[in-house]
């Protein structure tokens, strides 16, 4: 019979009531802490074409959610609806427990009813795009300090110091004064990740961050993303990289025709798919 180990045997005794109170406070804090992101019943229509047909998901703190699916399944549209780059037609979005206040626009889509709230909520989210979206007329460093200075109101010296730290993290400090045109695709995407980190978001959104890269450059970007996951950052990643989805994410979501067709533990979802459509998708991605 194994003898249990009591690491705190020499610790001072605490009154049972105090112990219970501390445990209750800890449980209460864990219970009421809002999730970084929650979507409920999200729809998006373009005329008669419905791209999203009621998507719901929850990202808990430290989650890495990989969203997989064929082209046209609604993956990128979903990310763009989260931060209102696209206006959803129906549904609810909560960021840090705060529901976005939405109203109907002239086309019948939902738009933010409170611009100050939109700016505040967007500061909790940061998106890394397929094609980097760096300003070509600015250096890497200038790209990264732009939002902290002009959106968050940081002092320039503090923004530069933080930006340089993030560039160290992604391995680009030595190229901080380069313009994007003088960087490889992988370097540009790493700069884009540093730019996203600079606003200290609660959730990082990645829209197929390796799809525009040459195959030999994919690994350097995935390694940076893996290090962010190991730091406990909350990430939602639209990806075709099945290895990343399996090994780095803790939850996989298969989107098909605007619906969550299957989700769960990545190893199980990818190794033992229940739906025929997911089996076909995985088979095709391995060719």
Map each language-model feature to its residues.
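Conserved signature/switch motifs of ABC ATPase nucleotide-binding domains
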Residues: 178, 199, 231
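Conserved ABC ATPase signature
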Residues: 179-183, 187
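Catalytic Walker B motif of ABC-type/P-loop ATPase nucleotide-binding domains
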Residues: 204-207
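The feature captures the beta-strand-to-loop junction immediately N-terminal to the Walker
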Residues: 68-70
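ABC ATPase "signature
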Residues: 263-264
């Amino acid at each position: 019979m194994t003898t249990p180990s009591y690491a705190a045997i020499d610790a001072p005794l605490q009154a049972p009531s105090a112990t219970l109170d501390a445990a209750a406070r800890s449980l209460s804090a864990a219970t009421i802490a809002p999730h970084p992101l929650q979507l409920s019943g999200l729809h998006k229509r373009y005329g008669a074409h419905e791209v999203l047909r009621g998507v719901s998901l929850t990202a808990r703190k430290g989650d890495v959610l990989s969203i997989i699916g064929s082209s046209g399944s609604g993956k990128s549209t979903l990310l763009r609806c989260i931060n209102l780059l696209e206006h959803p037609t129906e549904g609810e979005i909560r960021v840090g427990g705060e529901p976005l206040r939405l109203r109907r626009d002239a086309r019948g889509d939902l738009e933010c009813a409170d611009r100050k709230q939109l700016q505040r909520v967007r500061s909790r989210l940061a998106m890394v795009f397929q094609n980097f979206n760096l300003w070509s007329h600015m250096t890497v460093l200038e790209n990264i300090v732009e939002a902290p200075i002009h959106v968050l109101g940081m002092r320039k010296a503090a923004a530069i110091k933080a930006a340089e730290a993030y560039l160290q993290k992604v391995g680009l400090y030595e190229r901080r004064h380069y313009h994007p045109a003088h960087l490889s695709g992988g370097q540009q995407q790493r700069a884009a990740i540093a730019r996203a980190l600079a606003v200290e978001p609660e959730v990082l959104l990645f829209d197929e961050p390796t799809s525009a890269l040459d195959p030999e450059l994919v690994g350097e970007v995935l390694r940076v993303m893996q290090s962010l996951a190991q730091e406990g950052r909350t990430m939602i990643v639209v990806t075709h990289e099945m290895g990343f989805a399996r090994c780095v994410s803790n939850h996989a979501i298969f989107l098909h025709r605007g619906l969550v067709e299957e989700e769960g533990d990545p190893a199980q979802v990818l190794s033992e798919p229940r739906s025929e459509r997911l089996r076909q998708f995985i088979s095709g991605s391995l060719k």
